[in-house]
């Protein structure tokens, strides 16, 4: 950097009031700049001082291949030993999938940036919501939960997952239809595929992988919950397996690689001791091994079931819970006569 002429008083003021950016180990010859100024740095360069208050733009560039060689000693190589595993976990995630799902902020955080739905900064606000005063003692755990403010994600920070239906049957369905659609979720799945993935149902697998990776590497709990809900929808859609057999062949491959990344007891509910995954896959295998299903899918499902039984000692031989009598809550006003 060339020496600059500056008023001594201004220089003294900026020395104490201005900012300093420290940049260590920048290779000689690198082009470095701040705002409209840029330089090719020498061996003694360590940063910039006396930066005036305000917004600034720092930029740098390796000007040629020779300089890239100098940078080599400061760079860690990509661990290619894990590349195959990474590809297997992201094989259906396209650029369009990332653009559609990633937060508008383009940052994925383990803990959501949340705001209270209602500010309730003052006692009168709490009274308006029929909430007890903060100083009073909680009489139960549920009361304690009720006192917590309702929160919502800060706009632009949430992962934009597809909205999954909570009602699995069409409006106006008869009691018999409600029961059928509650046991076979194909109607709900087709609604998701038609609205979110028109013309390309395989893209739902990209969203399944995106959710899993966000949980596995980013520790995003909301992504794990979405992965479970989406997987449940896919595994409990018997009619859809016949229609979208190629999608389900690929689903088995995806699950094979995903389940290799987590402990066998990870999905066990600590309260009920029920294993979400075994119960969900039990229904899936029961449907996928049907004679009505494509032979390729059926054969792959049988091999996958045998693999999981051997590796995790999961029992899929027992009768699925879905074969037991199912109690279905009918919408208000639905007649059973």
UniProtKB/Swiss-Prot annotation:
Keywords from the named record: Acetylation, mRNA processing, mRNA splicing, Spliceosome
Gene3D superfamilies according to UniProt: 2.60.34.20, Aar2, C-terminal domain-like
Subunit structure, interactors included: Interacts with PRPF8 (via RNase H homology domain). Component of a U5 snRNP complex that contains PRPF8.
Gene Ontology CC: spliceosomal complex
UniProt superkingdom: Eukaryota
Originating organism: Oryctolagus cuniculus
N-acetylalanine: residues carrying this PTM: 2
Function summary: Component of the U5 snRNP complex that is required for spliceosome assembly and for pre-mRNA splicing.
Name of the coding gene: AAR2
GO-annotated biological processes: spliceosomal tri-snRNP complex assembly
Protein name (record): Protein AAR2 homolog
Similarity section: Belongs to the AAR2 family.
CDD domains reported for this sequence: Aar2_C, Aar2_N
């Amino acid at each position: 950097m060339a020496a600059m002429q500056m008023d001594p008083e201004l220089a003294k003021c900026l020395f104490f009031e201005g900012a300093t950016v420290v940049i260590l180990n920048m290779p000689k010859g690198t082009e470095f700049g701040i705002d409209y100024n840029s330089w090719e740095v020498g061996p003694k360069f360590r940063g910039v001082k006396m930066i005036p208050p305000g917004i600034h733009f720092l930029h740098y560039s390796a000007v040629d291949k020779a300089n890239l060689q100098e940078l080599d000693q400061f760079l860690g190589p990509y661990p290619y030993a894990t590349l195959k595993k990474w590809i297997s976990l992201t094989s259906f995630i396209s650029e369009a999938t990332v653009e559609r799902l990633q937060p508008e902020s383009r940052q994925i955080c383990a803990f959501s940036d949340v705001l209270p739905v209602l500010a309730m900064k003052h006692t009168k606000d709490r009274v308006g919501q029929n909430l007890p005063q903060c100083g009073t003692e909680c009489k139960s755990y549920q009361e304690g939960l009720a006192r917590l403010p309702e929160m919502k994600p800060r706009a632009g920070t949430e992962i934009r997952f597809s909205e999954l239906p909570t009602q699995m049957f069409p409006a106006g369905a008869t009691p018999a239809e409600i029961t059928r659609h509650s046991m076979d979720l194909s109607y709900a799945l087709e609604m998701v595929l038609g609205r979110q993935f028109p013309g390309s149902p395989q893209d739902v697998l990209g969203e399944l992988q995106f959710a899993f990776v966000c949980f596995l590497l980013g520790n995003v709990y909301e992504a794990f919950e979405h992965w479970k809900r989406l997987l449940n929808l896919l595994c409990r859609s018997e009619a859809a397996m016949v229609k979208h057999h190629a999608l389900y062949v690929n689903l088995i491959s995806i699950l094979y690689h995903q389940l290799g990344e987590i402990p066998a007891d990870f999905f066990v509910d600590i309260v009920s001791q029920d294993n979400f995954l075994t119960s969900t896959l039990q229904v899936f295998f029961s449907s996928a091994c049907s004679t009505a299903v494509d032979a390729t899918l059926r054969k792959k499902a049988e091999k996958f079931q045998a693999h999981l039984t051997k590796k995790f000692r999961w029992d899929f031989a027992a009768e699925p819970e879905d074969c037991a009598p199912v109690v279905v809550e009918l919408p208000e006003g639905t007649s059973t006569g």
